Amino acid sequence: MAPSSLLLSVGSLITSSLVSATALEARQSQTYQLAESWQGESFINDWNFFDGADPTNGYVTYVNQSFAKQSGLVKVTESGSFYMGVDYESTLNPNGAGRESVRIESKNYYTEGLYVIDIEHMPGSICGTWPAFWSVGKNWPNDGEIDIIEGVNLQKANKIVLHTSGSCDVSGSNDMTGTLSSSECGEASGTVGCVVKGTNGSSGDPFNESGGGVYAMEWTDTFIKIWFFPRSQIPASLASGNPDTSSFGTPMAHLQGSCDFAERFKAQKLIIDTTFCGDWAGNVFAESTCPMSDPSSPMQSCVNYVAQNPAAFKEAYWEINSIKIYQYGVSAASSAAVSQATASKVEGTRVSAQAANTATPTVPAPVETTTVPQPAQTNTVATSAADHATPSSAETTTVPAATGAPSVSATEGGDSELESTSTVYVTSTTTICPVAESSSAAAAGGKEDAPSNGTSGAEVAATSVAAAAPAAATSGHPGADAIANSAAATSTDAQSESATSRLTAGALSEIPTAPPEPVSQAVSTGSFDDSDTAQGDSEEQGSIASASVAPSTIPVPASSSAAALGGSSIASSFASSRLIPRPTGSSTAASATAIATWSPTAGESASGTAKESATLTTPSEVFFTPGLSNGANRMSVGLSGLIGVMFIAALA
């Protein structure tokens, strides 16, 4: 009895053979369907124009699309074909910029299939030229390169070359009309690659004299075959648009062997170009019987010839009727592309904002102030404080926007994502000032009453209010730099705000590169009365009749947040250094960081004499100081805890 391991090996071999045969039969039973096609104007509009330095070190200046069209280097002929030529009028300096030419690249990368190019004319057999129709993967040489049509100088036969990484050997015993001169496609052969020399007349002058023809490449995971058909010998199935490679006959190149084509040749973009001299044409210039102006340097002789003989390159042009890509089971409505090749199509970085309960700041509830209902589930960041935030009674918190940050809608406990081209982190600044009725639409919010939650000032002092600013993106879309998630800051007997006494948030200013210079004025002045003084142990609040903020912007740390809470409340973090006027007439310098909630109440008139109240907590130093206005009016002081209250009482 045979060992079980032997039986398993035999069974695996039989199974593998059956699977391979089945796959081959399935492939043979399929037909190629058109997946991509270009002709005429689509070459100009749907391909990228490469205008960088020549990777092959040629004496060439590749031009962009606009210049190529204006100068006539690319155009659509009367017959509808695509013309792509070179400058054949300018005499050049051999030590200057190279001859103008065009290199176009497909925008997408493509995988296995049947590639068909119908060429009416290709660059002729001209000294110094190096035309090519080829493909290359994103990561050279690992993803491979396929040179379908390539030749230099006076050559009249095409050279088909494959390049890839490692070792990739193909057999010379495959049936083909061309001649295999190198069987190693990988780096083991240096930069030579595996090379098949085509039949005479497959490129250059003889190709053009016979009216051009069609090249077809079949690329699978096991082989690459390339056919050349002169104009008079194009297969009927190919001409009808229903290609059947089994009727194509013997290919010019049949590259197959121990090389793993599925691993060595990945998705490729197509390239058509004409360069001059360079690493190949320049180095073999002397071997091509081209004129040697410098016997010691074939390369310099090539450059001299190209620079000083413009008329020689009148025939160095491509005229292409079409390029088509066929694939199994892929309709023309589907894309054969596997990825985008241009930066303009790259997916952007996703930016998300998350509402976190642990970062929710708590503010004391004033006894007689108008407050804004807190959102039950959603925080919506407005895209523009002036244009997009409208008054609403919905339970929504509106944050004024900063230019350059994305619009983010965040659901509590979840994410909302936005695409952009890149991600940055920003620190915003904000300026708050009273505005007239016509500007009150800049902050959204409602006039609904809300019950008090009994939050005390002591709780405020102990609450962490660090709220990280979300990532922003340079997408050019307006958005917000922070989201303030305030706990239910409510009051008893909340009043409806007067239309003439709304205090709204101004648009966020541009991001400062450095903190602003101190301004020699108090942050806020106004008139007050004793009835607005807070009733809590450590709550510091007052009624502000005409609040104003210094003209300079105040930087908000990245760990803070600034928001307009509804239409009548504003919560912000401030940091500044000010000269504070004292009741005695002297001034005191004070550096302060404060978290304040401004809640305007009903006004007395439209002249700005309305009473408004504010809640303020300060970690350390004086932020608002007493200012005298209209005799008996006073303003409360922002200090920490009981010391602040005692200090206010002493000043009073």
UniProtKB/Swiss-Prot annotation:
Amino acid composition bias (Acidic residues), ranges on this chain: 529-540
Residues of the signal peptide: 1-21
Gene Ontology, cellular component aspect: plasma membrane; side of membrane
Chain intervals for the UniProt region annotation (Disordered): 379-423, 509-551
Positions annotated as active site in the UniProt record: E145 (nucleophile), E150 (proton donor)
Keyword Glycoprotein: yes
Lipid-anchored residues (GPI-anchor amidated asparagine): N630
Domain GH16: 36-289
EC top class, as a word: hydrolase
CDD domains named in the record: GH16_fungal_Lam16A_glucanase
Glycosylation positions in this chain: N64, N200, N208, N453
A biological process term (GO) from this entry: cellulose catabolic process
Record keyword Signal present: yes
Location of this chain's protein in the cell: Cell membrane
Keywords assigned by UniProt, alphabetized: Carbohydrate metabolism, Cell membrane, Cellulose degradation, Glycoprotein, Glycosidase, GPI-anchor, Hydrolase, Lipoprotein, Membrane, Polysaccharide degradation, Signal
EC number, as in UniProt: 3.2.1.6
Propiece residue ranges: 631-652
Protein's membrane topology: Lipid-anchor; GPI-anchor
Molecular-function GO term, any one: endo-1,3(4)-beta-glucanase activity
Biased composition (Polar residues): 390-410
Recorded family membership: Belongs to the glycosyl hydrolase 16 family.
Biological function: Mixed-linked glucanase involved in the degradation of complex natural cellulosic substrates.
Name of the protein in its database record: Probable endo-1,3(4)-beta-glucanase AFUA_2G14360
